[in-house]
Amino acid sequence: MSDVLDLACDLISRPSMTPDDAGCQEMIAKRLERAGFICEHLRYAAVSNLWATHGRGAPVLVLLGHTDVVPPGPVEAWTSDPFMPDMRNGILYGRGAADMKGSVAAFVIAAERFLAAYPQHPGTLAILLTSDEEGQAIDGVRKVAETLRQRGQGIDWCLTGEPSSSKRLGDLLRVGRRGSLSATLHVKGVQGHVAYPHQARNPIHLALPAFAALTARHWDDGYESFPSTSLQISNIHAGTGANNVIPGALEVAFNLRYNPHWIAPRLESEIVALLDQHGLDYTLHWHRSGEPFYTPEGKLRRIAREVLERFSGAPPEESTGGGTSDARFIAPLGAQCIEVGPVNASIHQVDEHVCLSDLEALPDLYQLLIERLLAEH
């Protein structure tokens, strides 16, 4: 069994459902320390974070990942135990195989190989791992980034190992992500009998015109390589369950995925102004998950393109699509951020998996990126 496969299987066998790290980072830290890294455990609330560095000064390259996984769901739906790595027909199955214990294992192997070849490399190689990427993302990289900012720690480049590839390893290079803004809207009405609507105020009826305006609004025409901003209503709750009672309150949850044309406070102001036009008695609670980020053309993107083309056989698509990632907390520190990882077709699903050939190639891919950025600096 190869080094990367052995380490990936060890990680998968640890049931680190967010925010539980299940000992993954402790095991990785011991291994990195043997390679010469200085490791610091940063624990906030129930979340484990590992900050490991080798070298000193600029440029600083951070390999960013997470050791937590989403719950497997019904275990009986899996072909094999989700926390017992299983290899079948050239594929490794297990929760976290693709998202993202395979990448974390590849980071470690790539770092070990790089340091063996370049023990006195220029700059700083850092690895940042959290157990709070799949959960609330409050006490993970968000909190670590605050700590690094307070210390004055600069970061030049950040490589996130999220499963970004579409159909084959290296066919997509993530160069940015949209921002995410969530809201919970509470609309007050007056409960009553459906036969006597004049004695009640139906919050659903009152809010419908506002919802229509929100969902029909054209927010923008996109921004550079970003798609246009989107608002989606995700949950609506009202009523007692009885079909003869007008509800007294309505709760609606919605989310915006927005491009750099916007910042969260401006979006919030626009939505409040729209709601106020409809005379609703409401309260609104916001949750800012992260602002958008974008890595412009430069050394990082150029090198990443060249490396990915070497591994995939064709130039990668450069994309800002998908959901959010922890890179959104590193970008505000001034870092240029990209995401490169395995195929994402099975992430969060039953029988999550990664092709063994892709897993075996990942350390070489990451090592080449590290060498091109640090050793050739």
From Swiss-Prot:
GO terms for biological process: diaminopimelate biosynthetic process; L-arginine biosynthetic process; lysine biosynthetic process via diaminopimelate. The keyword Endoplasmic reticulum does not apply. Keywords: Amino-acid biosynthesis, Cobalt, Diaminopimelate biosynthesis, Hydrolase, Lysine biosynthesis, Metal-binding, Zinc. Zn(2+) 2 binds at residues 99, 134, 348. It is an enzyme of class 3 (hydrolase). Its cofactor is Zn(2+); Co(2+). One of its GO terms (molecular function) is acetylornithine deacetylase activity. It comes from the Bacteria. It holds the Pfam family Peptidase_M20. It catalyses: N-succinyl-(2S,6S)-2,6-diaminopimelate + H2O = (2S,6S)-2,6-diaminopimelate + succinate. Zn(2+) 1 binds at residues 66, 99, 162. Pathway: Amino-acid biosynthesis; L-lysine biosynthesis via DAP pathway; LL-2,6-diaminopimelate from (S)-tetrahydrodipicolinate (succinylase route): step 3/3. Catalyzes the hydrolysis of N-succinyl-L,L-diaminopimelic acid (SDAP), forming succinate and LL-2,6-diaminopimelate (DAP), an intermediate involved in the bacterial biosynthesis of lysine and meso-diaminopimelic acid, an essential component of bacterial cell walls. Homodimer. Belongs to the peptidase M20A family. DapE subfamily. This is Succinyl-diaminopimelate desuccinylase. The gene is dapE.
